[in-house]
Amino acid sequence: MFKATARYIRVQPRKARLAAGLMRNRSVVEAQQQLSFSQMKAGRCLKKVLDSAIANAESNENIKRENLCVLEVRVDAGPMFKRMKSKSRGGRAPILKRTSHLTVIVGERGQ
């Protein structure tokens, strides 16, 4: 099993989980194709993390990418940047800029 992570990514976890659903339980070649045609910002971020996990597998254990599949995709919520928006009559409302931690684990089929 080979793991790659990206932390503090400026993508909402809820939207990133939608993109993560495109690559679950697929071979890495299929997952790369799905993410490369995805219009979502989270899809681009997940593709970079997937490419990193594939590179880890190829460089550390000399495993061919055709034998790899996506074992686990995890999207966790990171810290939120808090901003304020002015409202009427001198009030204000919070704006939460959400971040995500992305984790992709790949391995050989049958693990």
UniProtKB/Swiss-Prot annotation:
GO terms for molecular function: rRNA binding; structural constituent of ribosome. Keywords: Ribonucleoprotein, Ribosomal protein, RNA-binding, rRNA-binding. One of its GO terms (biological process) is translation. GO terms for cellular component: cytosolic large ribosomal subunit. Pfam families: Ribosomal_L22 (PF00237). It comes from the Bacteria. Belongs to the universal ribosomal protein uL22 family. Part of the 50S ribosomal subunit. HAMAP family: Ribosomal_uL22_B. This protein binds specifically to 23S rRNA; its binding is stimulated by other ribosomal proteins, e.g. L4, L17, and L20. It is important during the early stages of 50S assembly. It makes multiple contacts with different domains of the 23S rRNA in the assembled 50S subunit and ribosome. This is Large ribosomal subunit protein uL22. It comes from Chlamydia trachomatis serovar L2 (strain ATCC VR-902B / DSM 19102 / 434/Bu).
